[in-house]
Amino acid sequence: TYTLFWKLQIIRGAILMKKELSPPFKITNDILNLVYEIGELVGKISAEKEFEKNLTLRKENRIKIIYSSLAIEQNTLTLEQVTDVINGKRVLAPLKDIKEVQNAYEIYERLEELNENSIEDLLLAHKIMTSELIKESGRFRSKNAGVYQGEKLIHMGTLPEYIPELINNLFLWLKNSKEHPLIKAAVFHYEFEFIHPFQDGNGRIGRLWHSLILSKWKKFFAWLPIESLVQKYQKEYYIAINNSNKDGES
């Protein structure tokens, strides 16, 4: 199984190296209906402008975003502890978990400054997110990496030599695509996780970039806790990713 994963990665990586190749995906009627329904809800939220007026609500939601995104990655801090860390209070917890919160808060606070089409900004975001936590902070991994469930390999990341070109192609597609932002964000999220470009922090950065793409469409997405939904439906989230892996489509 391990060898088969690598063979499939080599084949798919070679295919995606072609210039201007779009990620493989189909837009079904169900997807179009969901885009329409979400668009209707987004319009109502935008009209209220609640996030722009209520700074307390924005901060509370940002804390929920950080708590959920890190909890998905097995960070042990509670929502209350995350709040205390962000507010500069002393928390008795593993230093690694505290540092993850501090790093995540720093980059989410700079979300509006990031260019969603910039690989340089992607690397900067990763550098901040993983500062003092991993050796290859702020750069693409140089070694093979996979995602494991216990001892079971559930996803093998793209071979390191393919990563720069694949990420470049993905960002070119993101910049030039005329698809709806909801579709672009979802496709990017999956393709990014499939490539698995970093030693660690791929999930956190993937969710960050998903929010970034949507925030360039509607500003309030910068404070909307999408990560909390991912945490709540984590099982379904991974099932969807695995189904895309099997189908070979975003």
Model-identified regions with their sequence ranges:
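FIC/Doc superfamily catalytic core
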Residues: 1-250
